[in-house]
A protein has these predicted regions:
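Polytopic transmembrane helical bundles with strong interfacial aromatic enrichment
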Residues: 1-300
């Protein structure tokens, strides 16, 4: 339960649903509890995080049990613990990968700039490929500097479109598209540019100030007009504090490489548990000291 509410709060900060901005209190106030508590982003984050915790616990149990085998102590207990932990770990690792796919889809829908940074993806296209492995160009500093994003990359064709839109032919916007806007959205509207969002944010900030001033002066008519303008632009409120559109782009190298480290570790854990299960059932794991070291070193 504690993990659920922590991750609900985290998901809300990344995709605020079930709330409205109250200009009288200058706060976002909840209007739909269940929209907050059961948002798709929160659900995905909960299962992905909890399952990842189970993977960690399983790795720890296998590693400690292999330490007992390495010391030639409590052999029966250690082997029984390894069998249970490896099965739990394998199931959790596979399910974690599945929920990770769901998290990727939610990021694509609600935080497309984060997805673009995760992929080092600057120019949108239909049937976009997913970078399986790549080396970013360290000379590329901004989205519009004209330099290639990669020195080298290996790509899985159309997989990014499949991840982001569940359609291998779908258009996925890149960093440049998200900054410049102009591409069609699924609701039939056209995406705003970052500069347009900044202007709307400034309009919202101005309307909020006008509303507070009108209320303080007792001018309800002006307050209603300002409240209407604020409501129309409040979704872009935060953009009004942005000075340069490049501030909206995350640290691409950090995001790109850390995402791949996470994916590689996920693949490693699945392979690790498969090997452990094979050895504990088909071989004499208690005599395989090299595997004891692998298991112990996997803990950190």
């Amino acid at each position: 339960i504690s993990a659920w509410w922590i991750l609900v709060a985290n998901a809300w900060m990344q995709n605020p649903v079930g709330m409205e901005f109250n200009p009288d209190t200058a706060r976002n106030e909840m209007v739909d509890f269940w929209a907050v508590a059961t948002s798709p982003m929160a659900v995905n984050k909960f299962f992905h995080s909890v399952l990842s915790g189970w993977v960690l616990a399983a790795v720890f149990v296998v590693g400690v049990s292999c330490w007992y085998l390495w010391k030639n102590r409590e052999k029966k207990f250690a082997l029984a613990s390894i069998k249970i932990a490896a099965w739990v770990g394998l199931c959790a690792a596979v399910l974690s990968a599945w929920t990770g796919d769901g998290s990727g889809y939610q990021v694509a829908q609600k935080q497309p700039m984060k997805l673009a940074a995760m992929e080092g993806y600057y120019q949108g296209q239909e049937g976009a490929g997913l970078v399986a492995f790549g080396i970013l160009n360290p000379d590329k500093k901004t989205a519009d500097d004209g330099k290639d994003a990669f020195l080298f990359r290996m790509e899985i064709p159309k997989f990014l479109s499949l991840l982001a839109e569940r359609d291998s032919k779908a258009f996925v916007p890149g960093i440049n598209d998200l900054l410049k806007g102009g591409y069609p959205l699924k609701d039939g509207t056209t995406a705003l540019s970052a500069q347009e969002k900044i202007e709307k944010g400034k309009t919202a900030i101005g309307a909020f100030s006008a509303y507070r001033a009108a209320k303080a002066a007792g001018n309800d008519a002006e307050a209603q007009v300002a409240a209407k303008v604020l409501k129309e632009n409040v979704a872009y409120f935060g953009y009004g504090y942005i000075k340069d559109v490049n501030e909206l782009v995350p640290n691409v190298p950090l995001t790109f490489y850390m995402f791949r480290v996470m994916v590689m570790l996920g693949g490693y854990f699945i392979l690790f548990f498969i090997v452990v299960l094979f050895l504990v059932y088909k071989k004499d794991l208690s005599q395989m000291r090299w595997m004891h070291w692998v298991a112990m070193l996997t803990i950190p």
